[in-house]
Curated annotation (Swiss-Prot):
This is Zwei Ig domain protein zig-2. Expressed in PVT neurons and weakly in some head neurons. GO terms for biological process: cell development. GO terms for cellular component: extracellular region. It comes from Caenorhabditis elegans. Glycans are attached at N40, N43, N137, N206, N216. Keywords: Disulfide bond, Glycoprotein, Immunoglobulin domain, Repeat, Secreted, Signal. Disruption phenotype: No visible phenotype. No defect in the positioning of ASI and ASH neuron cell bodies. No defect in the positioning of PQV, PVP, RMEV, HSN and AVK axons in the ventral nerve cord. In a zig-1, zig-3, zig-4 or zig-5 or zig-8 mutant background, cell body positioning of ASI and ASH head neurons is normal.
C-alpha cells in the first residue's frame, strides 16, 4: 500500500530538471524523469510464470512501455490526453509516480531475450534493459490463463494543482470491468465531477483539498477481481 513517504519523494524531486531540457511554461516546476524501479536479469524455467516490473517518477506524467528484442509488446507512448485537454492553458503540476508490470503466464523459448523498459515524459526518454533466459525441461502451457485480471499499469501517486482536472489510471492486459472507490465510497459517472472510461481511467474535475487520499481501482472478470491503490495530493498554485 502506498504511504505518505511517496508524497515526500515526489515533492522533494519535483524541482529537479531533466538534463538539457527547457522548462515548460505550463508546469509549476522543472521537468523531471527518473526510474524508481527497474527489472533485473532473470533465468526462468520453462512453464514458470514471471513478472517484470518497472517504475518512473516524472513531470510531465510519464508513460511506460515495453519492448522485447526491439518490438513493442506492451504500453503506450502517450497518456493523460483527456486531462491535458481539460487543463489546456492552465498551470499544472502533472507530476506522478507510475508503475508498469509485464507478465508472462507460462514461459517458453520465445520469451527469452532483451526486455527494454522505456519511460517517457514527452520531453525525454530513459531506457533500461533486462535479459531473460528461459531454460530447463520443456513443458506444455495451457491455452488459457483463467484467473482474475492482472493490472499491468497504475499511476501510484498524483500531484496536481487544486481546481484542475486530474486523471487516475489503471490498465489491464485483458478485457476488464472497472470500478473506482474513494474509501468506502463507490464513484460513479455523475456528469460533473467524476468520469470513468473503459480503459481504466478515472477523471476528477475541479479537484480540491477534500479530494486528497487513496483511491482504489478494481479490475473484475468472471474469475475474480484485483485491486490497486493510488494516492491523489492536491496542491496550491505557485
Amino acid at each position: 500500500m502506498l504511504k505518505f513517504t511517496a508524497i515526500s519523494f515526489v515533492l522533494l524531486n519535483a524541482a529537479e530538471s531533466v538534463d538539457h531540457q527547457k522548462p515548460i511554461r505550463a508546469l509549476d516546476s522543472q521537468p523531471l524523469l527518473k526510474f524508481t524501479r527497474t527489472p533485473n536479469d532473470s533465468n526462468v524455467t520453462f512453464g514458470e510464470k514471471f513478472v517484470l516490473s518497472c517504475g518512473a517518477n516524472g513531470a510531465p506524467l510519464p508513460s511506460i512501455y515495453w519492448e522485447l528484442n526491439g518490438m513493442r509488446i506492451q504500453g503506450e507512448e502517450t497518456s493523460n490526453v483527456y486531462e491535458n485537454i481539460l487543463n489546456d492553458g492552465k498551470q499544472v503540476s502533472n507530476a506522478a509516480m507510475v508503475s508498469s508490470h509485464y507478465r508472462i503466464p507460462c514461459a517458453t523459448a520465445r520469451n527469452s531475450g532483451a526486455y527494454k523498459c522505456i519511460i517517457d515524459n514527452g520531453l525525454t526518454k530513459l531506457e533500461h534493459v533486462a535479459k531473460v533466459f528461459v531454460g530447463g525441461n520443456k513443458t506444455n502451457c495451457a491455452l488459457n490463463d483463467n484467473g482474475a485480471p492482472f493490472i499491468s499499469m497504475t499511476v501510484d501517486f498524483r500531484l496536481e494543482i487544486s481546481n484542475n482536472a486530474v486523471a487516475l489510471s489503471c490498465r489491464s492486459e485483458t478485457a476488464t470491468e472497472w470500478s473506482w472507490h474513494k474509501g468506502e465510497q463507490l464513484l460513479t459517472n455523475d456528469g460533473e465531477r467524476y468520469q470513468m472510461f473503459p480503459s481504466g481511467d478515472l477523471i476528477i474535475r475541479n479537484i480540491s483539498w477534500s479530494d486528497m487520499g487513496e483511491y482504489n481501482c478494481t479490475a473484475r472478470n468472471h474469475f475474480g477481481e484485483t485491486t490497486a491503490i493510488t494516492f491523489l495530493y492536491p496542491t496550491l498554485a505557485k
